[in-house]
Amino acid sequence: MKIKTYKSSEINSCREASKITATILDELNNLISVGITTDEIDKFCLDRIKKLGGSPAPLFYRGFPKSICTSLNRVICHGIPSKDRKLEEGDILNVDVTTVIDGWHGDSSRMYKVGNISVKAQNLCNITHACLIESLNVIKPGSSISLIGKKIEEIAYLNNFSVVKDFCGHGVGLKFHENPSILHYYDKDYDNIKFVDGMIFTVEPMINAGKYHSKILNDGWTAVTKDKTLSAQYEHTVYINGDSVEILTESPNGVFYS
């Protein structure tokens, strides 16, 4: 498997795309509330991406009809924004934004809580965030990529949650999706694939309150939990810069998780 690597001096546009993505996700904290539709969130993000000098990677990507993904409650990922669904008290919503600047991609997603949510929903969000942050700590040149999935499973299973297996993180940079796949569960076949200096990739664990099984709805995109339980996801784009890990999509205002 060929893994694309980049010099730090050549990824400034990737840094800028990632910063725009993170800035917009920060701004959504003041927008998302009871009564707003996911289509309105999509329009807000599209407008902000354009005003900040970027373009939305998901729009028309393999036929996807919107600029962002909005995944609500039992939706695992790739939810399509809709005019028909207003957010309600107790909802949990993942918003996934990818900005492109000069061909470089910055990809991130976060969970948003609508009003007062259930204890179980809050715990799911807490643990999913922990899965992401703790898994970033295992990344270093020469270590096995499989360590990410091992760490995520360890945290999720300890809290009686499951890890989605049908979707994964991925290399990113001048393409939306590059090698390697970043699995969020342990697979021994990935023990011999190592992190290398200069890699850019996403880590984006999807954690379910029930079983890990998923299915795709008739729109061909929306992935939901088969058992209709809640799902949550957090995502960062990261860059291995020498011996350090640079979180490209870190919140400018320190509000990635709230």
Give residue spans per PLM region.
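Active-site neighborhoods and metal-handling regions in enzymes and metal-associated proteins
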Residues: 1-258
